[in-house]
Amino acid sequence: MSEVTIVGAGLSGLVAAIDLAGKGHHVTVLERESRIGGMSEFRPDPAGSPFDLEGITRYTGVDISPASKVIEDACVWAWGERFVMPMKAAVKLYMVERGSRESALDTLLFNEAVSRGVNVEFGRPVITQGDFAQLPPDTIIATGLLLESYEALSIPYSPLYGFFAKGTVDHDRTMVAMYFDDFTRDYGWYCTMNGVSFSILFQRDRPLSTGGKEKFRRLVARNESAEFSNWKDLLGGACPVGSIRNPRLFHGNKIITGTLSGVIDPFLFFGMLGALLSGRIAAMAIDDKGAAWEEFRKATMTYYPTYVAKKAFDLLVPDIARRPLMRAALKAAPRVEDRVMGRFANNIPGWRLL
């Protein structure tokens, strides 16, 4: 079987490596960080998504359930008013831990990859256009949100601006609180899992204001009793929503996977499911590009209407109208939670493959 190079040991890169190694390919993964888990300043951090765990196992061949927990408590703060989500829908929201700890999803995937003979080389950054050009054809690129990859490969993106903090908690609850307010046209959140806590406020395209960041910090401290002392600005982030044409499986003579390939919800940025499933699609592309393209097309078919919906929402709904619209929707949500969650999950890139 062939030698395959993968750039990035995140979710999609490792799923691709596991699949290819299982088929007899010799796989080398180049990871810029010194250990598994991605950007150390971010980790460990919990991250949530709707999952069909059995469907993910069937599609990828990897059981991620040991690293996944159902979200027990969820609420949304909309311009200062709190709305509790029942979390009784048939489609469940799960949380996974990202990072290098034994409880992290990254570690689970890394251990599975190594057990199948995958060679992961740490401290191997691939950053510049020249770096990428030197890689062999059919190299799989899985570099996620890193700005340098978008610029080196000339892939459209929206810059991400964030303000985040992490810490620990004295409980083991899996919970999330989302924040919508005048400090961002996107949102922020606070979450806990496995005894760690994480909070972030982010916005695409426009930097966050100093006043907005301070307001969010105060709200998290008051509402969640979370007095973080290590708030930092997120630097160098990018997301593949710079163009309606962002989704791509092939780029030149390379294969693109994960967030970089555009398998992400352009409205709320849910992308973990797409990262996992697209890893398997990238692996498929090594042996059968036509079949892989058909799977990728199915995975990303909801990207385009959601991209248009987000653009229309930002253009046509003024800030003054967002508060009553959001509050009205959240008041109605518990009564139609099952239907809403089903439709929401069905629009996340990748869900229709399960």
List each language-model region with its residue ranges.
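N-terminal FAD cofactor-binding segment of flavoenzymes
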Residues: 37-79
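Short beta-strand to alpha-helix junction loop
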Residues: 48-51, 87-111, 207-211
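FAD/FMN-dependent oxidoreductases across multiple families
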Residues: 70, 208-288
